[in-house]
């Protein structure tokens, strides 16, 4: 077993002043109850990088049932990994028990607390161990640093402090095996590389080119969560670039991947601008919706099918409705899209053709539509990408700046041309 390097408090930059008070409360209660209590994972990594952690996760030798007894405000969750969530109002601290690195090989998967499928993917992993075991179950070295509340030291088994310093993302263990255990680790590698501006170590990146197909076995609901983490991190543009570099986009958004591989420059400009806009909003701490992401990623295909249906004689509105259903029904086989978001995706798409109407009831109802703003933003990005060639973006931008009475004047129906009287003689 590799010996741990202990970095004492004077030799690292983590201060309790930067650790969430609630996380400290959980750490101290576990410690006072006689358990080992360690801050672990991204929280330690981010503190060392000078970032404000989004989450503070805790690892301990207390079993989930022990944590439940110690915290009346906790709940046990998960089947694949049994965890305790400790609730303080709306804040949740995740407490995980140290996991073992291996199990008694005389036990069958059916009789043990760990199970794999035929490709090596972990289905269940509730074999508990000690800190020195748990570290080898972590994914990347930079996520395997432990902050010990008992003496405020950092415990490092994997030379992770060097990787943090050198901004290198390195898998723990054999990369082929680790990716097969959980193919989502390939997406996590891309997410961390994009988010932290790290370089994936050559030994960890090479298998990604060969194992991307394993993502097809991941449940669509889990991929939905992972896609949001990738593209709602404030680094969506970089995430897309890395997904394309490692040829993984096809396993998430095949229509977008096909369009980009075919050299569709307009769509490439559009998707880049859409992600750039989302990144900007996230970094400005403005709200974003998954619906906008899915609408953008799938727009090229839905627009293409809609045009084909119109060419075959379907009215424009019906063509877009049918195209939307076709594309979404195919996409949810890969990534599930909750109905509350898929309905907004449909609205964004189906409102696009209505921006050409600038007068009368149709224009007024569009301006009043509850999803007008999302559809308008979408249309303006299409305009910036060169897909919308008229002045629709400028016109609809201007009308939103006007007071209601001036809007009504501008939206007033154009006067109908006078109808010729029956029997009127032509000159």
Model region roles, listed by residue range:
Residues 1-427:
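Catalytic cores of the polymerase beta-like nucleotidyltransferase superfamily
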């Amino acid at each position: 077993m590799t010996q741990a390097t202990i970095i004492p408090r004077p030799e690292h930059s983590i201060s309790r002043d930067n650790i969430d008070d609630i996380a400290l409360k959980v750490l101290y209660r576990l410690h006072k109850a006689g358990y080992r209590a360690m801050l672990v994972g991204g929280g330690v990594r981010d503190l060392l990088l000078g970032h404000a952690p989004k989450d503070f996760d805790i690892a301990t030798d207390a079993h989930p049932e022990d944590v439940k007894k110690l915290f009346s405000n906790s709940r046990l969750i998960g089947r694949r990994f049994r965890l305790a969530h400790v609730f303080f109002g709306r804040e949740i601290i995740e407490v995980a028990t140290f996991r073992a690195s291996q199990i008694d090989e005389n036990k069958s998967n059916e009789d043990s607390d760990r199970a794999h499928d035929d490709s090596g993917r972990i289905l269940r992993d509730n074999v508990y161990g000690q800190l020195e075991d748990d570290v080898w179950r972590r994914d990347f070295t930079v996520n395997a640093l432990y902050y010990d509340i008992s003496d405020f030291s950092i415990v490092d088994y994997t030379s992770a402090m060097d990787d943090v310093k050198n901004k290198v993302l390195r898998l723990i263990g054999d990369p082929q095996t680790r990716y097969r255990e959980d193919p989502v680790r390939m997406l996590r590698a891309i997410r961390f590389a994009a988010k932290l501006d790290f370089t994936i170590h050559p030994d960890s990146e090479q298998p990604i080119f060969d194992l991307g197909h394993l993502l097809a076995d991941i449940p669509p609901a889990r991929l939905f969560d992972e896609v949001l983490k990738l593209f709602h991190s404030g680094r969506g543009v970089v995430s897309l670039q890395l997904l394309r570099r490692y040829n993984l986009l096809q396993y998430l958004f095949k229509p977008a991947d096909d369009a980009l591989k075919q050299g569709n420059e307009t769509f490439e400009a559009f998707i880049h601008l859409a992600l750039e806009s989302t990144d900007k909003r996230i970094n400005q701490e403005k709200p974003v919706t998954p619906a906008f992401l899915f609408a953008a990623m799938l727009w090229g295909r839905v627009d293409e099918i809609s045009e084909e249906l119109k060419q075959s004689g379907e009215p424009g509105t019906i063509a877009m409705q049918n195209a939307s259903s076709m594309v979404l029904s195919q996409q949810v086989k890969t990534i599930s899209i909750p109905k509350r978001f898929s309905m907004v995706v449909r609205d964004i798409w189906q409102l696009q053709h209505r921006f050409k109407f600038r007068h009368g009831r149709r224009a007024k109802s569009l301006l009043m539509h509850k999803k007008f703003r999302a559809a308008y933003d979408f249309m303006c990005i299409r305009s910036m990408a060169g897909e919308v060639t008229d002045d629709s973006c400028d016109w609809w931008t201007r009308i939103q700046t006007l007071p209601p009475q001036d809007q009504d004047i501008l939206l007033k129906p154009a006067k109908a041309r006078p109808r010729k009287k029956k029997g009127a003689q032509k000159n």
